[in-house]
Amino acid sequence: MAKSAQGRKKEPTPMMRQYLEVKERYPEYVLLFRVGDFYETFLDDAVTVSAALNIVLTKRSNGSAGEIPLAGFPHHASEGYIAKLVTKGFKVAVCDQVEDPALAKGIVKREITDIVTPGITYSDKILDDRHNNYLCAVALFKRGREHLAGVAFVDVTTAEFRMTELPVAELKDFLQSLHPSEILISSRDKELRDSLAKSMNTLFTVLDEWMFSAEQASQVLENHFKTHSLKGFGIDGVEGGRIAAGAILQYLEEAKQGSLKYLVRIGLVESAETMTLDIQTRRNLEIISSMQDGSLNGSLLEVIDRTKNPMGARLLRRWLLHPLRKLEAVVQRHDAVEELLESDSMREESRQLLGGIIDLERALARIATSRAMPREVRLLGSSFALIPQLKAMLASCEAQRLRHLADRLDSLPELAETIERALDPEASGTLRDGGYIRAGYHEELDELRAISSGARDRLLEIQQAERSKTSISTLKVQYNKVFGYYIEVSRANSDKVPEYYEKKQTLVNAERYTIPALKEYEEKILTAEEKSQFLEHRLFQELCAAVAAEAASIQKTAAALAELDCLACFASCADEYRYCRPAMNEGTELSITGGRHPVLERILGADEPYVANDCRVGSDQQLLIITGPNMAGKSSYLRQAGLVVLLAQVGSFVPAESAEIGLVDRIFTRVGASDNLTSGESTFLVEMNEAASILNNATERSLLLLDEIGRGTSTFDGMSIAWSMCEFIHDRLRARTLFATHYHELAELESRFERIVNFNATVVETADTVIFLRKIVRGASDNSYGIEVAKMAGMPPEVIERAREILAGMERREVEVPTQREAPPRVVSQQISLFEEEESRLRKALSGIDINRLTPLDAMMELKRLQDIALGKSKA
């Protein structure tokens, strides 16, 4: 007996069963399912995609299982839609039809052909050609009692692949400087993900724990690099980094990324060679983004990035975040910049050539993974043709670094010549359109094309012959995709059709036929076209394989070109901005004459010339206490010193008349503060955390830039902390320090410590305002001019007047400062009233007066005494 409709099991359609099977394997991905000319999404994915892409959400029948949500888009527009999804943080799995639907028996076979995530993408619609796009992995482990993190990162678009190990406490800072688009973490380390996610707007992907095993990692790395040992890469002893690198390779292989053979090397992050810049320093110095809105505008990078090639732009960004610490390396860059600066013709010619070279790194990655179009390969070949000129110029240079770059350049003449012979520069440049292989490159392809191109003439011959045989002058030989080639005869002439005509289709006003000769030629034409397309594609794949086989040489050449671009960029900046070559040494002196802030001077322009300042800090004046009002230039002075040092150790010339710089191992900054609400930290706690990190990590070779330490708490607490920090820096760290403060009491330190010196930001007072000269000069300031600044800001007059009254009262109070280091300023735990002490004295004086016995003269005398008490002239 048949089951009722209600009791029958609800079954999805065969295609939906296929979809659900694939989706089960990729639950965390938006699954794009190819159906004819569309990519469709179903169920929850459809709802997600509809909202993310702002496309229509509709429904589709799912057999007895009812209707399901559906959203989709045309396959030819897929790149743009996928880019939008990935930019919004989604991971996308592309499931394509892998057999001809016309030949399929049952459901068309489908497979995952590509995976696109924020960390795995080659699309120009997603990538910024001036930024690296890093995929990172983190592996936590212990060595003895020490908790460490192994970190590996790769940019699949440039083949940069490196690793390191570091204490877990330094992990967040390292990752924030790297700014990866995606971070891989073991399922056992989900707490780490939750912790990092609070401060990083990055996609975290959790992988199975087995993918982070040491044994698995070694096997994966050795298989990939085709070696029995990793010692040759210098990473054999970096177990945590190897584990992370192994996880990355496994993730890429599972992500259907095609051949990864172009990832030909892996290296270590050489922490001893470069300076570490923590997040506070990167932010406060506005190295790659401004503090105002996080954009490039107003940053150091915006000012000095005059690179001509995306490879150079990406390297410049990395250089700025990792200044050099080795004197020889810094001097070599300065030598190269100086030679490029002195030779205008060589500098400009090299920059022009660099501008004509394609992004070799990203082109190679797309070619090696079968994602490139013929046009990109052709541009690669034409780029090789420019390299001999650059190589010849650099080989004749005196600077050792420039000659070294010449040695690393390889124009690959044989490959370039093959590309030139193979690809037609006049072709459309897409694989779909064909015609991109030059005529004369391959004999068989030429023959097949001849058959196809001669088809029209042959068809006209058949048409003319049949018109003669049948006496039907309107007879036509035509073609469509459904019926192929056919002969069309009008209904009026159908009685003249010979018996050997085989009917194919009947229309309202015509009949369509075929004949043996037409069938034979149709098969020949279609076979030739099919063979031609297949052969052309095969030849292109062979050409791409030849390019990929030279991956190591191309990457080495690309790295040399990027470095040349950066050095020429520095020379161009030095020429245009009047930068000088700094004298570098191993000492601990910092002496800048006529120093300028590289960003502010560009913003101000010619209408308001930037006020240059000298800065000398070292063995005899190690700690500069800088006082003065807001808006007078103290913070800019601090940042200016930091940026001059950073530029020098990156290899650039610097904005100054002259500069002598003893190498710095770290630059620390504490400028401004804000609440860290996500971590439950107040402004003052954030400030103290940053200050503690500086005191615990700085050395004698560090540069400390400290602004308004202690302002996040009460006056006396803050001043005590600032005072104590100055003592600690002077006595223990002995680091070069610029210390800007509103605590004028700190000026006392100069008389008590041999290497502490006072400076101040000068102002000129007029009758009703103050003028900030933005000049830093010797000596202490005795006024912060805060009320004048408030007045300039437009505070109501009554607020300004009341502030003056309160200030006058507060200035009559004396703050005791320690006479010895062991006796810090006395801390007042409570402040009942602004004039608590004055009120107490006045109360005592008033209570002791016997009004009934006062003569008029006595009353006048008592009034004078009370006035003196109020003005602080008497202690009562």
UniProtKB/Swiss-Prot annotation:
Which family does the record claim for this protein?
A: Belongs to the DNA mismatch repair MutS family.
Show the Pfam families listed in the entry.
MutS_I, MutS_II, MutS_III, MutS_IV, MutS_V
Keyword tags: ATP-binding, DNA damage, DNA repair, DNA-binding, Nucleotide-binding
Q: Which InterPro entries match?
A: DNA_mismatch_repair_MutS, DNA_mismatch_repair_MutS-lik_N, DNA_mismatch_repair_MutS/MSH, DNA_mismatch_repair_MutS_C, DNA_mismatch_repair_MutS_clamp, DNA_mismatch_repair_MutS_core, DNA_mismatch_repair_MutS_N, DNA_mismatch_repair_MutS_sf
List of residues binding ATP: G628, P629, N630, M631, A632, G633, K634, S635
Please give the organism. Chlorobaculum parvum (strain DSM 263 / NCIMB 8327) (Chlorobium vibrioforme subsp. thiosulfatophilum)
Q: What is this protein called?
A: DNA mismatch repair protein MutS
What processes does the entry annotate via GO biological process terms? mismatch repair
> Signal peptide: which range, if any?
none
